[in-house]
Amino acid sequence: MKKFFALVLALVMALSLVACGDKKDDSGDVTAEHTDTTTVAVGAVILARDDVSSDDVYKFVADIFDNAASLTTSHAKYGELSLEYGASITSVPYPPGAAKYFAEKGFEVASVKDGAGNTDSRNLRFVTGGESGTYYAFGSVIAQHATNNAGIDVVGLVGNGSQSNVQELQDGNAELAFCQSDVMAYAYNGTNIFADHGKVDCFSTVAALYMEQVQIVTTNASIKTVADLAGKSVSIGAPGSGV
């Protein structure tokens, strides 16, 4: 199962294209044609700078997973968390504090970052996402609960997407960050969108939280495959957002 998760995190499997026909009901609204589709799926992960103390990381991860079942009413994403998936990242090592927590729960991580976490406790700035997005809403709940219950001070910050969040870690403007798993790997290895910038390896993986699916929706009935998008305009997210 861990190999499966690793493959899903490392590779963009396929693109989900939901084709909506140009049929209209009596009200004039467009109605969708429902078909099974495959989906682009990457993991939503939390990263920590290597100078965040092991004790703080341990408390932070424990607060997320130990309280997930009781906090689904605070945010639905808590219901998607699992310890197995949380410990499944193979492309970037975990900090000792996170590795310790998952080991206590019976899950060994693939690798542990040597030298990470050898610092004192401090306030933690957690850069998330745009104010209207899931990263910000979920991250704010995580930060507030950890501050109120875990004995650490975490503040959620608005972010500008995965690539920007990694940059915030490198620049020392945040200690924790939401990121997509593919962007995380690009940064750590200095590939793809980080090829010109160079690798950023001042962080470790705190935990993988849930899978993110990306879908393309169209009202043009002639667009049924990815190839049909040739020459078409597609509305995407902000540069560096991962979408």
Predicted segments with their positions:
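Hinge/capping helix and adjacent helix->loop/strand transition within the periplasmic-binding protein
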Residues: 43, 47-70, 146, 197-201, ...
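Pocket-lining segment of extracytoplasmic ligand-binding domains
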Residues: 25-52, 181-183, 191-193, 222
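Pocket-flanking alpha-helical
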Residues: 139-144, 148, 155-197, 216-219, ...
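C-terminal motif of bacterial Sec signal peptides marking the signal peptidase cleavage site
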Residues: 16-19
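An extracytoplasmic/periplasmic, membrane-proximal ligand-sensing/linker region
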Residues: 25-27, 41, 55-124
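A structural signal for short loop-to-beta-strand junctions that line the ligand-binding cleft
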Residues: 29-38, 195-212
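Bilobed "Venus flytrap"/periplasmic-binding protein-like clamshell domains
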Residues: 84-101, 121-149, 154, 212-243
